[in-house]
C-alpha cells in the first residue's frame, strides 16, 4: 500500500517540469521517505481511533488510512512544488507552525525595555533634580507626554527632559512615540564623532540667521561667537529632529497625515543648557535679578503662524493662514484649496498634509549658560501657558513645599485657572516638567545619591538607578532610522537660510502672554 502510494506520488512528480536529473532523483527519494513515515504514523494511530471492520467487510479501516494518506500526499505535493527553491533546507512540515512574535509583541517589548531603563521617567513622578506631572483635560484622551532622563548618554552631568503636545486623531500616539524615540536618536547622534563635528563651520557662518533670541544672543555678543559645545550640540539636535520626523513618516501603524505633536527638549550638560523647540509649547527659566527677586526669562518662542518670518515661509509654499471667526486671535495654517486642517502652529512633528506647504520640523535651537542666580527651568504644554503667565508659573513653582510636588502644584493651578477664566470652555491637557538647577553643593549630593542608587541596582534589578548605558540599555530594535554616514544637513540648512528670527518678538522679559487656544 505504502509503495503504491509512493509510486503514484513519484509518477505525478515526473509529469511536472523540473531541472537536473540528479537533483530530481534526490527529491523523489526524499518524498518517498516522508510518505512512508507519514503512513507508518497513520497506521500506528488508526487502530486506537477506528473500530475494527466487520468480518468480510473488506477494509473500512484500510479505506480510512488510504484516504488520510492520499490527503497527506496531496498536501505534501503542493508544499514541495511551492518550496522547491534553492533556499529550502528543511521540509515544509516543520514550518507550518508560526514561530514569529505575535502582532504588537515587538512594540510591547520595546516599551518594556524603555520603562526598565534606570534614570528614565516618562510618567507622573519625581527624582532628585526634577518633577513631572500631567493631567488629562476635558477634550478626550490625554495627548500630552513628557520625559526626564537622568545620566543621559551615561554622563553623570547630563539630563534630558522634554514635553510633547499631540494633536489630531492620533496625536497621543505621535506624542508618545516622539517622547520615546527622540532622546534615543539624540543620544545615538551624540555618541558619534560625526554628530559632534558635522556642519559646525556652517552653523557658525549661519549663526546670525538661525540663532534664537534670549541669552544665546547675549552670549554671542560677549564672546564674539557661540560656545563650541553649542555648535556641536545644535547639529545633533537638528539631525535628531530630522530623523524623528522621517521615522513618523515611514511608520506603518501610526497615521501622521493629519496628526502631529509639538516638542520642547532641554539637554543640561554641566552648566550648559541646549533648548530645542517645535510648536507652541514653552520653556522658561526661573532666575534672580540684581535685587535678588525671582523673575521669569522665556527660553523659547511660541512658533505660531502669526510670526512674520513663519508666515512668510508658509505663504511662499502656498499654505494659507487665517483665523476662524469664533477665534479671531488664533492664526491657523490651512491647505491651499481646502479649509483643513487649521493647525495653530508653524512647526511640528508629523502633520504631513502640510509639510509641502510651509510646515517644517526643524527646531529652533538656543543656548543658555547656567549661572549661580538660575534656580529652575519649567517646560510645559500650552494648556498651562493659555491660562498662566510666565511670572505666575515661576511664582507657583517657587512656593511649592518640595521639588517633588512642584510640577503637580503647577498643573493643578492651571486647571483651577481654566475653570475660573473659561468656565464654558473645555480644559486642555496639561503637562509640566520642572528641572532644578543645582548649586555645587546640591550637585555633589546628587552625585552621591546616584552612586548609592547604582550600588542598590546591582543588588536588585527591580530598583531604579541614575546610571544608564545607552548603547546597551536599549535594544537595536528600538533605535530605528538612526542617521548613517551618508546623511547630511544640506536640506535642513537650506531651509534655515529662509527662516530668520530677526522679526521674532523677544519675550524674554517674563511678561504675561496673550491667551490663545488651539
Curated annotation (Swiss-Prot):
Record's protein name: Probable protein phosphatase 2C 14
Keywords assigned: Hydrolase, Magnesium, Manganese, Metal-binding, Protein phosphatase
Organism whose genome encodes this protein: Oryza sativa subsp. japonica (Rice)
Biased composition (Polar residues): 197-213
EC number: 3.1.3.16
Compositional bias ranges of the Low complexity kind: 1-10, 86-105
Lineage: Eukaryota, Viridiplantae, Streptophyta, Embryophyta, Tracheophyta
InterPro entries associated with the record: PP2C (IPR015655), PPM-type-like_dom_sf (IPR036457), PPM-type_phosphatase-like_dom (IPR001932)
Free-text comment on the cofactor: Binds 2 magnesium or manganese ions per subunit.
Pfam (any one): PP2C
Signal peptide boundaries: none
GO molecular function, one term: metal ion binding
Amino acid at each position: 500500500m505504502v509503495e503504491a502510494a509512493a509510486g503514484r506520488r513519484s509518477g505525478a512528480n515526473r509529469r511536472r517540469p523540473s531541472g537536473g536529473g540528479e537533483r530530481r532523483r534526490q527529491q523523489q527519494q526524499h518524498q518517498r521517505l516522508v510518505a512512508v513515515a507519514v503512513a507508518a504514523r497513520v497506521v500506528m494511530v488508526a487502530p486506537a481511533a477506528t473500530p475494527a471492520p466487520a468480518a468480510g467487510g473488506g477494509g473500512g479501516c484500510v479505506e480510512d488510512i488510504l484516504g488520510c494518506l492520499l490527503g497527506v500526499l496531496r498536501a505534501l505535493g503542493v508544499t514541495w512544488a511551492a518550496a522547491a527553491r534553492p533556499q529550502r533546507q528543511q521540509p515544509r512540515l516543520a514550518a507550518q507552525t508560526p514561530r514569529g512574535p505575535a502582532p504588537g509583541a515587538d512594540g510591547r517589548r520595546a516599551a518594556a525595555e524603555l520603562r526598565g531603563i534606570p534614570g528614565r521617567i516618562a510618567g507622573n513622578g519625581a527624582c532628585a533634580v526634577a518633577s513631572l506631572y500631567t493631567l488629562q483635560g476635558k477634550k478626550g484622551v490625554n495627548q500630552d507626554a513628557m520625559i526626564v532622563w537622568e545620566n543621559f548618554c551615561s554622563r553623570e552631568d547630563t539630563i534630558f527632559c522634554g514635553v510633547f503636545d499631540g494633536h489630531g486623531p492620533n496625536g497621543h500616539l505621535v506624542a508618545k512615540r516622539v517622547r520615546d524615540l527622540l532622546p534615543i536618536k539624540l543620544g545615538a547622534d551624540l555618541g558619534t564623532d560625526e554628530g559632534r563635528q558635522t556642519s559646525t563651520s556652517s552653523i557658525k557662518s549661519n549663526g546670525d540667521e538661525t540663532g534664537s533670541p534670549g541669552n544665546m544672543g547675549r552670549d554671542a555678543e560677549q564672546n564674539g561667537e557661540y560656545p563650541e559645545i553649542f555648535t556641536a550640540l545644535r547639529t545633533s539636535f537638528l539631525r535628531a529632529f530630522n530623523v524623528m520626523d522621517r521615522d513618523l513618516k515611514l511608520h506603518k501603524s501610526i497615521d501622521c497625515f493629519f496628526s502631529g505633536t509639538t516638542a520642547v527638549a532641554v539637554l543640561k550638560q554641566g552648566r550648559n543648557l541646549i533648548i530645542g523647540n517645535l510648536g507652541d509649547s514653552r520653556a522658561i527659566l526661573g532666575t534672580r535679578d540684581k535685587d535678588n527677586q525671582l523673575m521669569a526669562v522665556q527660553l523659547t518662542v511660541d512658533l505660531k503662524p502669526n510670526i512674520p518670518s513663519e508666515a512668510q515661509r508658509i505663504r511662499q509654499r502656498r499654505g494659507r493662514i487665517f483665523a476662524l471667526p469664533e477665534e479671531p486671535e488664533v492664526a491657523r495654517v490651512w491647505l491651499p484649496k481646502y479649509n483643513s486642517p487649521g493647525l495653530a502652529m508653524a512647526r511640528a512633528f508629523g502633520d504631513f498634509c502640510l509639510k509641502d506647504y510651509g510646515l517644517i520640523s526643524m527646531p529652533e535651537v538656543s543656548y543658555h549658560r547656567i549661572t549661580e542666580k538660575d534656580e529652575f527651568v519649567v517646560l510645559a504644554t500650552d494648556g498651562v501657558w493659555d491660562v498662566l503667565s510666565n511670572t505666575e508659573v515661576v511664582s507657583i513653582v517657587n512656593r511649592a513645599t518640595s521639588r517633588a510636588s512642584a510640577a503637580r502644584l503647577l498643573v493643578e493651578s492651571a486647571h483651577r485657572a481654566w475653570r475660573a477664566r473659561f468656565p464654558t470652555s473645555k480644559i486642555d491637557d496639561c503637562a509640566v516638567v520642572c528641572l532644578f538647577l543645582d548649586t555645587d553643593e546640591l550637585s555633589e549630593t546628587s552625585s552621591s545619591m546616584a552612586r548609592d542608587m547604582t550600588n542598590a541596582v546591582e543588588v536588585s534589578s527591580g530598583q531604579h538607578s541614575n546610571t544608564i548605558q545607552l548603547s546597551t540599555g536599549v535594544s537595536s530594535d528600538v533605535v530605528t532610522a538612526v542617521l548613517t554616514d551618508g546623511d547630511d544637513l544640506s536640506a535642513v540648512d537650506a531651509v534655515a537660510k529662509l527662516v530668520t528670527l530677526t522679526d521674532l518678538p523677544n519675550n524674554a522679559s517674563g511678561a504675561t502672554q496673550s491667551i490663545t487656544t488651539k
